[in-house]
């Protein structure tokens, strides 16, 4: 994301409370200002699911019902379609109605290209051992409410077997991060559910305004150890990582991807992003 794009986003959101953010995202979509869109699915997520299937709920020809996945802040839905290719029934959620409209059009374009034999869409084909792509649904609404669940014909008690967060947490103001952690804990299936986070922008100092707001390994550890609690900082400004409490999440794996989006690379082409895999304590 260029400095110009970061400056426009930060000037739009940085000094505004979370409650005022709602109308601003649809306005940016209506302007067709979407610097967070990567033009395709996460290479890091694709490679992880192929290489480490033991770390996520499996999907095979005998899996019934299919596990459910959620992508909050899904934008045009590239990662939603990717997870469907791995066999998950996926809900793509975004606050902006225009995002849902573009996601629907993107899905239509991908399916048409597949029928025409376009090899560039092979990433969205069912993976080996997966009988067919999972069902895809698009929802519009506030991640922190239950209205989008009802819109997707799901009960408010619904939990998900896999949740993928990329450029969602970093879009929220720092004050909303404990609320994000609590909501993720509530939405994750306690029986084997996995939260997969692609850390971006990794290492950006928290003193620099966002969005995107900076993230570190310790930020996730502190937030998810005690969902809903505000992390504390040490005298040197580093984040204190507390012990995990009941209802918290533990990190199962921290992966340095071999590939990621260009936005997650250093100037020399090395990968800056990290990929985290989490489960609820006891899961």
Q: What function would you assign to each model-found segment?
A:
Residues 2-70, 76-158, 174-283:
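Class I (Rossmann-like) S-adenosyl-L-methionine-dependent methyltransferase catalytic domain
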Residues 164:
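A conserved beta-strand element that flanks and buttresses the S-adenosyl-L-methionine
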